[in-house]
């Protein structure tokens, strides 16, 4: 009898030890899998760190971001968009915001309230006459997605994209224009430290226009203005107009006629890792980024959206673009996209 009890005791002890070892191994296995994912991500995005300490620190950030992305994507209902582990996955949200935005929105809005409102040429366009959907890519008025890198000159990319579109609509030629010319030569803005599309339009009008991207290529950093490279001019503008503030219907009228530069709050976590679908994520109306509205439409489930062209490369979003919810309850628009919009005139 004693022998039988001893056998039972040994079996329980061995089984308990086995279960305990499995329990311990699971977190270890998960950690190894995550480390492998980080290494694969580094290879995919060409990320090289200065030393082991930096790599370890970036791994922790990467892990936290991945876990949060996967948690948010697992929410079963109410989310019409997905997030992805993209090229920004080893950056904290604060780091991302400081490196990849650059719209001087707060100062722009405060000064706008003190100035006379500009004319709006589409004011009398009947809403009923507007097309149900617009996509300027299909009409040949949008150049391929560009990448501002870690230079905070989104304002320049937004302004240039709007001018590229207006030029194609007016002259029938789609020309890739120079953002670097604005970064280097527009002294009313701040290069990689940020700027505003309206002041960029003013600079372009005053200096006679923009040259091509190939003539004055993008470097992703501030440099001295090379006046020789600013010529010959590929296009010019007569000025710009602001879209009435906090009015998505007015914005729709403008976008139906041409691509429009738009200020937006693009520094949030959901925006950082947006991958696909109609964006309805968390954001504020503190404008910190600039994009270009190039269309609008409605998905098969009835979700209305804007199409925006970003300047973070093709690995972000829907090959560099985002569909973001349109006609929301808040008059400012989702992420404030109806607060500060403007377009060039040719």
UniProtKB/Swiss-Prot annotation:
Its EC number is 3.4.22.-. The active site is at residues 154, 289, 310. Glycans are attached at residues 124, 301. Disulfide bonds join 151-192, 185-225, 283-335. Residues 1-25 form the signal peptide. One of its GO terms (cellular component) is senescence-associated vacuole. It is found in: Vacuole. It comes from the Eukaryota. It holds the Pfam family Peptidase_C1. InterPro entries: Papain-like_cys_pep_sf, Pept_asp_AS, Pept_cys_AS, Pept_his_AS, Peptidase_C1A, Peptidase_C1A_C, Peptidase_C1A_papain-like, Prot_inhib_I29. PROSITE patterns: THIOL_PROTEASE_ASN, THIOL_PROTEASE_CYS, THIOL_PROTEASE_HIS. Good molecular marker for age-induced senescence onset measurement. Keywords: Apoptosis, Disulfide bond, Glycoprotein, Hydrolase, Hypersensitive response, Plant defense, Protease, Signal, Thiol protease, Vacuole. One of its GO terms (biological process) is defense response to fungus. Found in senescent leaves, especially in senescence-associated vacuoles- (SAVs) containing cells (e.g. mesophyll and guard cells), and in senescencing ovules of unfertilised pistils. Disruption phenotype: No visible effect on senescence. Belongs to the peptidase C1 family. Cysteine protease that may have a developmental senescence specific cell death function during apoptosis, heavy metal detoxification, and hypersensitive response. This is Senescence-specific cysteine protease SAG12. The lineage of its organism: Eukaryota, Viridiplantae, Streptophyta, Embryophyta, Tracheophyta. The gene is SAG12.
